[in-house]
Amino acid sequence: EQGFQNAVAGASEAIVVTTPEMSAIRDADRIIGLLESKEEIKSYKLLLNRVRPSLIKSNEMMGVDDVVEILSCPLVGIIPEDTGIITSTNKGEPIVNDENALAGKAYRNVAQRILGEEVPFLDLDEPKGFMAKIKNAFAKLKAKV
């Protein structure tokens, strides 16, 4: 707890970063409880990291809405799991500099939200390739018929 006290000393706002795993969510819930007990902390938000939509779809990972409901904390961002982060870190280059990286875009959006801008959350289920986009468009068209 002393480490927590040192970390929040002088802070008036906080961002709780967690992953959609039960042990991490329990830890985040404990941190939120500690933040709520600090008069100096006027607001706090949740940043959900390492989100994998495929695992959410297969019910192997908790969904974003479920985590937000459990923690009762406003969401500031969703960062998808991205192997490009490992590569960029090893090169010493921030992922936010990669215009094509979904995680980089997600981090840029978080920064904009922190600055008070209204930015929609990324659709992490978006098809990646050209053919996938065409198939998705036809599937949507077929669903309307």
Task: Give the residues covered by each predicted segment.
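Alpha-helical structural motif
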Residues: 81, 103-106, 130
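A short, charged, Gly/Pro-tolerant segment at domain boundaries
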Residues: 109, 113, 122-145
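Conserved catalytic-core segment of NTP-binding enzymes
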Residues: 1-77, 81, 86-87
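Alpha-helical scaffold segments in soluble metabolic enzymes
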Residues: 6, 30, 106-109, 113
